[in-house]
Amino acid sequence: MHRIDVKILDDRLRTHEPAYATPGAAGLDLRACLNAPVTLHPGETTLIPSGLAIHLADPGLAAMVLPRSGLGHKHGIVLGNLVGLIDSDYQGQIFVSAWNRGRETFTVQPMERIAQLVVVPVLQVGFNIVDEFPQSDRGAAGFGSTGKH
C-alpha cells in the first residue's frame, strides 16, 4: 500500500479518520466538516471543508474528489466542478464543491459523508509537434462515430 501524508485540520475527524470502507473500495469518504447544517436549494453550489489536507508529494500521483453515488442518484447532490483534481504538490485543505442539481432542497449535516477521494497514477507527457498524424481506422471521427450498439 502506498502511503501519503495527511493533516487532520478538524479534530472531529480524529474519531472519523479517513479509511476505505471495504477491502475493495477505491475511494475514501470525505466528510462535511461544518459547524452547522448547510441548506442547498435547487441549483445552488457551496464549498464544504473536508477537514483534511493531503500531500501526495509524488508527481506520479494525483487525487480525484468524486461524488458519492447515492447522494447524486437519490438527492441530486453532485460536485459543482464535476471532478476535483488534487495535484501532487498541493498541500492545502480539500474542499468539496457541492451542487444541488435536484428539484428539492437538501441539507448537508455536519460530519456527513459528502464525497470520496480516489488516488490515481498520473503520467506526465512531453509533446512532439507534428503537421499530420499517421492514418488510423478512426481518424478524426468524434462523438457517436463508433455506433450506437
Swiss-Prot record:
| Any GO BP | dUMP biosynthetic process
EC identifiers of the protein? 3.6.1.23
Task: Please give the Gene Ontology molecular function terms for this protein.
Answer: dUTP diphosphatase activity; magnesium ion binding
What keywords are annotated for this sequence in UniProt?
Answer: Hydrolase, Magnesium, Metal-binding, Nucleotide metabolism
Which reactions fall under this protein's catalytic activity? dUTP + H2O = dUMP + diphosphate + H(+)
User: For substrate, which residues are the binding ones?
Assistant: R68, S69, G70, N81, L85, I86, D87
List, separated by semicolons, the cofactors it needs: Mg(2+)
**InterPro entries given for it?**
dUTPase, dUTPase-like, dUTPase-like_sf, dUTPase_trimeric
Q: Which CDD domains match?
A: trimeric_dUTPase (cd07557)
Pathway it works in? Pyrimidine metabolism; dUMP biosynthesis; dUMP from dCTP (dUTP route): step 2/2
Its family remark reads:
Belongs to the dUTPase family.
Cited function? This enzyme is involved in nucleotide metabolism: it produces dUMP, the immediate precursor of thymidine nucleotides and it decreases the intracellular concentration of dUTP so that uracil cannot be incorporated into DNA.
Q: Which NCBIfam families match?
A: dut (TIGR00576), PRK00601.1 (NF001862)
Concerning PANTHER family, the annotation shows: DEOXYURIDINE 5'-TRIPHOSPHATE NUCLEOTIDOHYDROLASE
Q: What is this protein called?
A: Deoxyuridine 5'-triphosphate nucleotidohydrolase
